[in-house]
Design a protein with these regions (language model features):
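P-loop NTPase catalytic phosphate-binding loop
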Residues: 5-20, 38-234, 238, 251, ...
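All-alpha RGS (Regulator of G-protein Signaling) helical domain and cognate RGS-like helical scaffolds
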Residues: 22, 26-30, 34-37
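Conserved P-loop NTPase
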Residues: 235-276
Length: 276
């Protein structure tokens, strides 16, 4: 297949599997066993190499059961901020790391910069140590570090400046690992992050965060800022239903660290995380 045809296939796949999402209310997810043969998930680089070249300003979300890539347009407005949720241990941090590493594979540091705020910066150390990766990161900070507050303030200032037509530059992918930790932060960082969740995309700042599903029903102030939900294993049907998304049925059969479900424009579809 020629490069042109491969690119056309990649774009068509993106449009079919992850169209812009216009609302949070969804239909019933299809969590039944795949009818097609499940293809073993390769590494991120192997998946992307199969369909090069990829459109810039994208990242990999996962792969379908047949191995077709599941892509996200980092600048797509209607998908809004992304919330990765599920039970503890379902793979939320791994999911954010897949987004980060695939962003590095697809985009240059001049196109996309990645910033991370997390409970445990050591979980991200291996990515930073890979050759050439550090150029893509503007910082990885623990919630307890002053750097986290400084980062949020800098991004809010950048967003406001870009809203006035100043300081164009790289798209920023802000990954917030374990969002509930912000509940203990001071007002300044909470207010700044909330602004970024609601307004960041208008200024080229894409936010994706993770939160245990059990905390979602009692924190609508934060959860309501997200438009796209990537849902991992939730053992309790009651917890899954309490997310308030129409059509979210049982997710207890999703494989921890491997499988998630997302709305794709017509229904909820299961996908798998690649190895990074």
């Amino acid at each position: 297949m020629s490069d042109t045809n491969m690119l056309a296939l990649a774009v068509e796949t993106y449009q079919r599997l992850f169209p812009e999402i216009k609302q949070r209310i969804r239909k019933e997810p299809d969590l039944s066993p795949a009818k097609t043969q499940v293809v073993p998930i390769p590494r991120i680089d192997e998946i992307l190499d199969m369909i090069q070249p990829l459109p810039p300003q994208t990242c990999l979300i996962g792969t379908c059961a047949d191995g077709v890539p599941f892509l996200l347009n980092l600048t797509g407005m209607e998908t809004g901020s992304l919330l990765v949720t599920g039970d503890p241990g379902c793979g939320k941090t791994h999911h954010l790391q897949v987004m980060a590493e695939s962003t590095i594979h697809i985009n240059s540091p001049h196109e996309v910069q990645i910033a991370v705020i997390t409970r445990d910066p050591d979980e991200w150390a291996s990515l930073l140590k890979k050759p050439g990766y550090s150029r893509h990161f503007s910082g990885v900070y623990g919630w307890f570090e002053q750097g986290a507050t400084d980062l949020i303030n800098q991004l809010v200032t950048l967003g406001e400046s870009r809203g006035s037509g100043r300081h164009p530059g790289a798209t920023v992918l802000l990954l917030v690992d374990d969002l509930p930790d912000i509940f203990e932060a001071d007002y300044e960082i909470q207010n700044g992050l909330h602004w970024l969740l609601e307004n960041g995309l208008f200024s080229g700042i894409r936010v994706a965060a993770s939160m245990d599903a059990r905390f979602c029903p009692t924190n609508p102030f934060w959860v309501d800022t997200f438009r796209t939900f990537l849902i991992g294993k939730i053992e309790s049907d009651a917890t899954a239903q309490s997310l308030g998304l129409d059509g979210v049925g049982s997710t207890k059969d999703l494989m921890p660290q491997v499988e998630f479900s997302a709305y794709t424009g017509e229904n909820w579809s299961k996908y798998r995380l690649p190895v990074n």
